[in-house]
Design a protein with these regions (language model features):
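Processing junctions and N-termini across compartments
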Residues: 10, 38-41
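Short clusters of hydrophobic/aromatic residues that line enzyme substrate/ligand-binding pockets
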Residues: 27, 113, 177
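Structural alpha/beta surface segment adjacent to cysteine/selenocysteine redox centers
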Residues: 32, 40-125, 158, 192-193
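Conserved S/T- and glycine-rich ATP-binding loop of Class I adenylate-forming
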Residues: 36, 44, 166
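C-terminal cap of thioredoxin/glutaredoxin-like
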Residues: 52-55, 122-195
């Protein structure tokens, strides 16, 4: 996922915030014709697959060319013991512009920290000591905790009951895409919407 981080660095002028999304949790132009909100859980194996396999393809084919605006949403499932903690750290890191780096490492090392419970140790490895101190404080901040809960509430309101779930919006039409995603099918859907 280092390639993704490098691509994001090159895209900084293109990255923009939606009025209801943290700017560091979005990719692409908010003026893109398609908006995809990805509700994911850092302990979810299918979310890991989406992040590591599908997201780079979406970046290349749709986000960089300005066809898709992607918003990352936290949806920690109760069945996953450490996912809410991970979501809190990732959301706190977003306040410092470090969301993608933290998300990348959480997904990359999901099995290890999911078994050990050492979420913080995993997150701290991709932060400077100064950033780590700020993220630890921010993760306890009520505004960060409420941001995670807002994502969860938005997902529940949209009828989401599994991760990953993508809500694809084109104009006034919204299409849920739940579970593990086949990129060729997703691509067909997006290309159909763009016609």
């Amino acid at each position: 996922m280092k390639v993704l981080v490098l691509a994001l660095t090159a895209l900084l002028p293109c990255l923009a915030a939606s009025s209801d999304a943290d700017p560091d949790k979005t990719l692409g132009s908010p003026n893109a014709p398609i908006r995809i909100e990805v509700f994911s859980d850092f302990e979810c194996p299918a979310c890991k697959g989406l992040h590591e396999q599908i997201l780079p393809l979406l970046m290349k084919d749709y986000i960089i060319p300005g066809k898709v605006f992607l918003v990352s949403r936290e949806f920690p499932l109760r069945m996953h013991q450490y996912s809410r903690e991970a979501a809190g750290y990732a959301t706190a890191a977003a306040r410092l512009g470090k969301y993608q780096q933290v998300a990348d490492t959480l997904f990359l090392t999901q099995v290890a920290w999911g078994a050990s419970g050492k979420v913080w140790d995993t997150v701290a490895k991709v932060l400077t000591p100064a950033e780590a101190g700020k993220v630890q404080l921010l993760a306890k901040d009520p505004t960060v905790l409420s941001e995670v809960q807002r994502d969860v509430d938005a997902g529940i309101a949209a009828g989401i009951n599994q991760t990953p779930t993508m809500i694809v919006t084109h104009g006034t039409s919204r299409f849920p895409v739940a579970g593990a995603v086949n990129y060729n099918l997703l691509r067909s859907m997006l290309d159909g919407l763009l016609k």
